[in-house]
Amino acid sequence: MGPLRLLVPANIRHNSGGNVYNARLVEGLRALGAEVEVLPVEGSWPESTAKERRRMGSLIGAWERETGPGEPVAIVDGLVAVGVPDELEFAAKAGQETWVLVHMPVPEESGAGSLEREARALRAATGVICTSSWAADVLKKRHGLRGLRVALPGTDRASLAEGSIPPHIITVAALLPNKDQVLVVEALARIRELEWTAALVGSDQADPDYAGRVRAAVARHGLEDRIRIAGERKGQDLEDEWNRADLSVLVSKAEAFGMVVTEALAHGIPVVVRAGTGAVEALSFAAPEQGKSGTLPGTAVHFEGTDGPEGDSPEGPTLLAAVLRGWLQETITRDAWRAAALETRSRLPGWDQPARLVLEAVSKNWPQDSPGQS
């Protein structure tokens, strides 16, 4: 097998789960002895200009196949891939080996054109690797794809969070409409009579308009002294945020996996997620076996009938507030979630696991099954 060429979107600059996965995957592949070249590709992916698509095509051998003993194997981030279906089809015709790494399927509401581009891109690929079973299931049902590989994210070992008094609730995600921090603020406003503090940790520059909405919601309820908008944190600053936390909340409208879920669990922190998203897989895949304790390290909240396009139906915050109230007031619930999170810590896989799975998938010696149609 020749060197691996990982093509990633250059326009996603905040600390997204996809960026973290890509970086850790590269580290893992290199640790296994693979030669890896990382190429950030300019463009407003998945949208792009003709010039950007032509350059992308040249990087995957769409116009002229790179031959020789060191012929590279391309792995294209899914966000880029869905923007270049023509180029991927040309690369396939040229015999160039090109894989697609899917972090998040195209949202269903994106329209028929976007979904068709996704289907064409994935069918043209040599193979498709998904970073969650949820994403693989969506693509299989949506496009009839087969032979999809799954390489779940790994998790770094982490120190046990000390927690805080009063209990501290944390949401770690860029301030984006999909992450629905406004829902979190509205839920917290409904339990203001209880003792708690909260922090929203994540980039406020990814979508400044939405970040403004989050700040306005905090101010409207007079919660500036209780809800801290921390901005993006990395390294020890992020570790300090985790150390203060007693509960993590991730209620994204769509989530393929939710690496911050397992990151929280690695610190022994239980998590509340939205039912019907891939975050449920993250919450449960390393959880204690049902026969042993039967308790998840947190819960998945059902928002059926409340998830409008803006996520601001009045029932949503009330449902989340009820869950948070129960956790704050019921010692049995709080202790059970914490115990399950502590047990889960030792069961979380490291980053060597997805690296091995990806390397096995793209290896010439690995039996291939083109995505095609099932």
Language-model segments: residues:
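Carbohydrate-associated surface elements
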Residues: W134, G154
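Glycosyltransferase donor-sugar binding loop
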Residues: T197-A216, G231-E232
